[in-house]
Each structure stands twice: as structure tokens, then as C-alpha cells.
Amino acid sequence: MWGPGVTAEGLSVAPAPPPLLPLLLLLALALVAPSRGGGGCAELACGERERCCDATNATAVRCCKLPLHAFLDNVGWFVRKLSGLLILLVLFAIGYFLQRIICPSPRRYPRGQARPGQRPGPPGGAGPLGGAGPPDDDDDSPALLRDEAAAGSQDSLLDSGGGGRGRGGGGRSDPSCASEHEMRVVSPVFLQLPSYEEVKYLPTYEESMRLQQLSPGEVVLPVSVLGRPRGGVAAEPDGGEGRYPLI
């Protein structure tokens, strides 16, 4: 005698929702039914994952893949194309982390601070003009490498220039007596190449090549050449540019 949704006390109650199980079953059947292949198309027997398709020609009948399987095939093809790139990225990441673990970056110490196990220099000796302080802590910096290369070239110039002047009476002291600090801080302006008087008696390139081709017994030099001091001002025997012909 009571209508639906009305209780005995006269209060209205919402009707119960329909069960979800039948809806889920219908949805599953709708998804599975299109993916089920098989069967035949006139005289053709389609495979398990194929179905009959309408061709452009009404009389032609053919089998085609199901939409779900065609989509999965396209995804698999795309993943195979990217598999090489993905493998390279994974190998790069592994190598990077191994390099960071095996070869960590060196610690940077502030300028003037001694490393562990190194004696600190006296105050004021760690600057660019301090000769007794420790070298710059940043050993692998490009500026320090350039300074060391410049110091080596300056040392070679000092050796060649100072030695020639000492033998020729130029009055310059032996550069070996100079301290390492003086060699490092000396300005390139004061470094000069040997004078022409000191090197004009050296053989030319052609003469050097001829001397290398000749045996030691065939090379004979004048007595005046052997007795002439380097940088001397005696008269040149051939009247040329100070070079002696080979005899």
C-alpha cells in the first residue's frame, strides 16, 4: 500500500542504486568482443587477431588487424626505434656516476691556506712576490701553467743570453746564481736576445747541413777561427759577413 521510496513513518527515501556488477560485465563484453578475431570472410579465413574489413572495391574481401592490436604494434615499433637511444642514455648515466665515484673533483683551498700535510709559509710569503712561501694551491689552473711555461722560456733566454755575454765580456753575471724567485718575477722587457756580434760566427743552415754530411776527418777549419774569441772584433779573413768557407 506504500509507494516506492516512502516509509511507514511518511519520510521519503532515495531509491537504491542499480547494481554495478551487470554494468561491469557489459563493459568487459564490449571490449573483448571486438578484439576477438577469427571467422571467415567469404572464401578467406581470418586469423585469430584479424577480422573482415571493407575494401575500396566492393567485390574485394580482405582481413585486417583489430584496432587494439594495430595500436600495440605501432607502439612496439616506436619503442624498438628508440631502444638504441635509450641504451646509450643509460650507459652514459652509468659512466657519469662511476666517474664521479672513482674520480671525485679535487678540493679547492683558499689562496694562502696550506693543504693538509704541507707547512704554511711565513706571513707575506704566499703572495705573488713572496719567494719563501708555498706555491699556489691551484696546481691545475691554466694561469699557473702559463706562468710555469713563461718561467721556463725566460730561464732558457737567460741561459743563452747571460752565458754569451759572460764569455764575450758583456759584464752580466751567470744566471745560475740568480734565485728562482728572480727568474719568475723578472719582466720580459729586460730579457734580450744575444747581440749580432755574439752569434754572427755561427754557421748558417746550409753550412750546418754540409757539416752533417761530411765526416769528422773531412772538416778542417782555419787556425784563425779556432783562436778567435767569441765576440771578437778581429778582421774577417774572407771579407764577407763573418762566415768562413769550408776547406
From Swiss-Prot:
Transmembrane regions listed in the UniProt entry: 82-102
S-S bonds: none
Cell location: Membrane
Keyword terms of this UniProt record: Glycoprotein, Membrane, Signal, Transmembrane, Transmembrane helix
Membrane topology: Single-pass membrane protein
Predominant location: membrane
Extent of Gly residues compositional bias: 160-172
UniProt signal peptide: 1-35
Pfam family, one: DUF4719
Keyword flag Ribonucleoprotein: no
Keyword Signal in annotation: yes
GO cellular component terms given for this protein: membrane
Protein name: Uncharacterized membrane protein C3orf80
Organism: Homo sapiens (Human)
